[in-house]
């Protein structure tokens, strides 16, 4: 089986550069598994985990939106934000989740921006999920 050159980049810089045998990402249309030789595509990403099948096992990256471009043996992910599992501070992520849940509760009571509170909660849960996958 061949391999893919994978790049995950945010506005703050590169998060992951490496080789993978498979990339699994959740797009707006559903989950996609990308193998070498995949048809070229561009797809918007949801807030979720990007799983990279590598020789040593699997690496998880918490991605908070963006786009994935597949072209030949190249997979480029341009993410709003992204963190590798080993870079996630679980205490900070848990606190962010708690703040987002409180904000969501207030949003429902006070009719303030519920959408922003839901997005903050999704991002926090996504980071926790990435960190705890092992």
Swiss-Prot record:
GO MF terms held by the record: ATP binding; proton-transporting ATP synthase activity, rotational mechanism
Superkingdom in the source lineage: Bacteria
Range of residues in the leader sequence: none
Protein keywords: ATP synthesis, Cell membrane, CF(1), Hydrogen ion transport, Ion transport, Membrane, Transport
Location within or outside the cell: Cell membrane
UniProt KW Secreted keyword: no
Keyword Mitochondrion: no
Topological relation to the membrane, as annotated: Peripheral membrane protein
GO cellular component: plasma membrane; proton-transporting ATP synthase complex
Function: Produces ATP from ADP in the presence of a proton gradient across the membrane.
Family (UniProt): Belongs to the ATPase epsilon chain family.
Quaternary organization: F-type ATPases have 2 components, CF(1) - the catalytic core - and CF(0) - the membrane proton channel. CF(1) has five subunits: alpha(3), beta(3), gamma(1), delta(1), epsilon(1). CF(0) has three main subunits: a, b and c.
HAMAP family linked to this entry: ATP_synth_epsil_bac (MF_00530)
Protein name listed in UniProt: ATP synthase epsilon chain
Gene of this entry: atpC
């Amino acid at each position: 089986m061949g391999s893919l050159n994978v790049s995950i980049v945010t506005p703050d810089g590169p998060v992951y550069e490496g080789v993978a045998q498979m990339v699994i990402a959740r797009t707006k249309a559903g989950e996609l598994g990308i193998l070498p030789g995949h048809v070229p595509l561009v797809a918007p990403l949801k807030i979720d985990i990007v799983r990279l099948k590598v020789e040593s096992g699997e690496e998880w990256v918490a991605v908070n939106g963006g786009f994935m471009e597949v072209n030949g043996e190249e997979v480029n992910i341009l993410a709003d934000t992204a963190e590798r599992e080993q870079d996630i501070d679980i205490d900070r992520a848990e606190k962010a989740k708690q703040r987002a849940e409180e904000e969501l509760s207030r949003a429902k009571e006070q009719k303030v921006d519920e959408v922003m509170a839901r997005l903050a909660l999704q991002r926090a849960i996504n980071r926790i999920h990435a960190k705890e996958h092992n």
